[in-house]
Amino acid sequence: MGRGFWKIPVCLGLVLCSLAEAQKIKVIVDQDARGPGTSDQQAVLVFLNSEKFDVLGITTVSGDQWVKEETQHTLRMLELDGRTDVPVYQGAEFPLINSKEESERWEAMYGKFEYKGAWTDKFKANRSIIYEMPYHDPDVVPPMPEGEPKIKAHSGTASEFIIEMVHKYPGEVVLWAGGPLTNYALALKLDPEVATLAKEFVLMGSGLYANKGAIDKGAIDARREFNWWFDPEAARIVLRAPWKKMTITPIDISVKTRYTTGMKAQIAKAGTPIAQYLDKYSLPGYMWDEIAGIALIDPSIITGQKKLYMDIDIDHGASYGKTLFWDASATVPPYERLADVQFDIDVEKFNRIFVDLMTRPAGKR
């Protein structure tokens, strides 16, 4: 009998490992992952570097850059982080209806947009863009300063992958969005059950009360935020879907955060490949997307939120792409859905968690 005792701790260890895996949050990370080293990519790293997440896959969507370019930057970052186990699925190249030409017609009538993502005529090197780049067509992938990836995206579309995962793990998958909502809108149109099968929908987007003077890129005005403006029709489809729970990180809370030179220096001291990557390519600025990930790790960082009915204006006039919202007690049209909208944050705690995640060693958690 004594010879069998060694099996007990081994079996117990296996059971505990299995329980830990089962308790992880299954998540699909959908992102307009401009790279290298932006808030977009830093938000993806939040999920990759936390032991609380089982990242089923990363899906890319045009927004801050064209999707082919974003996909390549994401694949390269996975290599640097030792997370080539995570599949990447390339998603929508264009919004459902909106287009570069449509936005230019709007500008001719109503005024200029400061920031247009992939449609921007020229990215100028400044405090939020690390290298200058002129506009290019969606099929062009410019030379990558961080190096070309050796791994490739998986076959199949982002929307197909989303549908497959919520059916495989009904009631377990958190769907997360850090960019325009095109991939999720397409998934919902292909299979309306996506909303009821998902555990929760979490997104960064919308603008409600933010002071325009405090916003340098995320909004054209206080209620027209980039992610929703880039594909308003997709946002309408997603916002009206019957999610069990929907949580929204608007720019109102994002502009209360700053990625500082001090945080960057702390991260650089770790000396890991990702720390070196961020030291070389990240720049100080608002942390647009990271809040929506870290709040899933530690909800206590959110110190204030409201229940609001959320929608978007898709009338092709002066208000196209603007956030619409009503208080939970209001009488609203029958299609609007309630969401938990974040407004206040414990910045110190948020910063500590972020720096910790960015300094962890490479490899699967």
Set out the residue ranges of the language-model regions.
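Bacterial N-terminal signal peptides that target proteins for export
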Residues: M1-V10
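Bacterial N-terminal signal peptides
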Residues: P9-C17
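Sec/Tat signal peptide C-region and signal peptidase I cleavage site
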Residues: S18-A22
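Conformational coupling and interaction surfaces
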Residues: Q23-I25, Q42-S50, D54-V55, F226-R365
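Active-site histidine-anchored catalytic micro-motif
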Residues: Q23-T84, E101, D121, A125-T247, ...
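A short, structured active-site edge motif that brings together acidic residues
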Residues: P87-P95
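A short acidic, often aromatic-flanked loop/helix-cap motif at beta-alpha or helix-coil junctions
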Residues: F94-N98, S254-K256
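A charged helix-plus-loop insertion that forms the helical arch/lid used to bind
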Residues: R105-F123
